[in-house]
Amino acid sequence: MKNNSSPILSVQHLSVTFPKKGRFFVKEQASDQVLSDINFELYQGKITALVGESGSGKTTLGNTIVGLVRNYTGEFQFEGTAYNPLDMSHLRTEIQYIFQDSLSALNPRMTAGQTLNEILLIHHSNENVDSILEQVELQGEIAGKYPHELSGGQRQRVNIARALAVNPQVLICDEVVSALDVSIQAKILNLITRLVRERNLAILFITHDLNVVKAFAERIIVLSKGEIVEKGSAQEIMESPEHFYTQTLIAAMDS
């Protein structure tokens, strides 16, 4: 097991701008700053929650880490070595992204088993479809079903299984339980917690809902209008929030 005291992934002075669209024949005059001077670390064996309202920049941050956003400045390190998100083919298996929309994330023409088997073959894994499904608490018969035949919770488990198939060290989970009912949310969160413990994963858990992470994450980062307004241990943030925005989120949660 690697040293968990050093960050597996760090983001330093990240800023992201998107160009404003000009009107008709007017040239673009300015840019919208979506993220401003973002700094944080992820640690193996730890769940870090990134919390903020819709439009705060959470998904943009996650997308930038894995190279889905081009207009950024800042530095990224994986295991202490700098990397370029726009040229990270060597890290594709190390950092996996799980999206909110579990249905569109899966190929509708492939069964769950075909989807997983394709990944296992490409990466010459010693795992098999049944063992990967078992790790996410799904029965073998799920392998023969198409995405539209699965429940939302089952589809999200298949997406988690697909990420696990390449044996990653970091998972970015983007609102992965927001479309599920409360009972299914709890089961998925328990699954993620177990996987963190068993696989020593580092998790960036993106959510708008503090209720989801209050007893789930070790650390919380609060994002508002593209800026980190507060970060610290989950206990510190939940019991003694310092920033007004964080206080507002917690008050809304308790109401």
Protein language model features and the residues they cover:
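Conserved ABC ATPase signature
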Residues: 146-150, 154
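ABC ATPase "signature
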Residues: 231-232
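Conserved ABC transporter NBD signature motif
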Residues: 74-83, 91
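Helix-to-loop junction immediately C-terminal to a conserved catalytic motif
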Residues: 66
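A short, surface-exposed alpha-helical micro-motif characterized by mixed small hydrophobic
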Residues: 213-215
